[in-house]
Amino acid sequence: MATDGTGVVTVYGSGTNGAALLEPSNHKSATFSVKVGLAQMLRGGVIMDVVTPEQARIAEEAGACAVMALERVPADIRAQGGVARMSDPGLIRDIKRAVTIPVMAKARIGHFVEAQILEAIGVDYVDESEVLTLADDAHHINKHNFRVPFVCGCRDLGEALRRIREGAAMIRTKGEAGTGNVVEAVRHVRSVMGDIRALRNMDDDEVFSYAKRIAAPYDLVMQTKQLGRLPVVQFAAGGVATPADAALMMQLGCDGVFVGSGIFKSGDPARRARAIVQAVTHYSDPKILAEVSSGLGEAMVGINLSDPKVERFAARSE
């Protein structure tokens, strides 16, 4: 993990190289730096999906750094099918009133009006999410048009840098939400980290052709090479169901973890939530991980992703 020596990730756009992201508008560049800084405040934390104010309070008491307000967790979206849209603003307001930690909410990819509504009701972060049904299969939201920070998913370095160019202040792996199966999240993290390791060994001439090959902006590719990491915080998401899963993602180099269906589809949600928070905090200590993993009851029932009938949410956009 590249830091400034104090354990803090370098904020993209805060230096002369970073200013290239949003040229020629210095105002936009400053605004983006603020949004990246807000996302960076969640580093080292766990963000939990909740569907009621009571679940939100359980998440806060367990030590979550933020909650994601939803009408249905991803496991229910998979099971029930149909069109998945932005949650009812009234529900989001109720969840906001119930907790003191930041509240996120999801908008459909490309649906900038849903994002406008979420910003208007005061959510702290918007997740432009492939878990919801696509609204636009050709365009993502121009996130620079908003004051609220955005979270976006990725499967590889090129996808991550394209979302950052659009204004994403936080990147998460897509994984396969609602499955309780961490294999795709691991694949996506390893892909991003492997691409960055390869990039660091390239000379500057090679970076031009590499940026074209992965369809990513050259300036962002070069900055990623210099930092040795993404220019924004990177969280793991999609299939994280146990404390061991969460610690695995942290050891692979993530800055934090999203946990969706894995908590409130388990046998003892409050205890599992506390255990996952502890696992993220102490991810490199196997003794603590063994202790917090004990006596949690049944984990959520997972889905075998080798089954070709399983819908792949992660493939919904690039």
Swiss-Prot record:
Active site: 106
Keyword field contains S-adenosyl-L-methionine: no
Residues noted as binding D-ribose 5-phosphate in the record, renumbered to the chain: 49, 178, 239, 260-261
Pfam family, one: SOR_SNZ
EC id: 4.3.3.6
Listed GO MF terms: amine-lyase activity; pyridoxal 5'-phosphate synthase (glutamine hydrolysing) activity
Keywords tagged on the record: Lyase, Pyridoxal phosphate, Schiff base
Catalysed reactions listed for this entry: aldehydo-D-ribose 5-phosphate + D-glyceraldehyde 3-phosphate + L-glutamine = pyridoxal 5'-phosphate + L-glutamate + phosphate + 3 H2O + H(+)
InterPro entries associated with the record: Aldolase_TIM (IPR013785), PdxS/SNZ (IPR001852), PdxS/SNZ_N (IPR033755), RibuloseP-bd_barrel (IPR011060)
Keyword Lyase: yes
Binding sites annotated in the UniProt record for D-glyceraldehyde 3-phosphate: 190
GO biological process, one term: pyridoxine biosynthetic process
Source domain of life: Eukaryota
Biological or metabolic pathway of the protein: Cofactor biosynthesis; pyridoxal 5'-phosphate biosynthesis
Database matches in PROSITE patterns: PDXS_SNZ_1, PDXS_SNZ_2
Other remarks on this protein: Vitamin B6 is an essential quencher of singlet oxygen in plants, that can protect cellular membranes from lipid peroxidation.
Function summary: Catalyzes the formation of pyridoxal 5'-phosphate from ribose 5-phosphate (RBP), glyceraldehyde 3-phosphate (G3P) and ammonia. The ammonia is provided by PDX2. Can also use ribulose 5-phosphate and dihydroxyacetone phosphate as substrates, resulting from enzyme-catalyzed isomerization of RBP and G3P, respectively. Also plays an indirect role in resistance to singlet oxygen-generating photosensitizers.
Protein family (similarity comment): Belongs to the PdxS/SNZ family.
Name by which UniProt lists this protein: Probable pyridoxal 5'-phosphate synthase subunit PDX1.1
UniProt gene name: PDX11
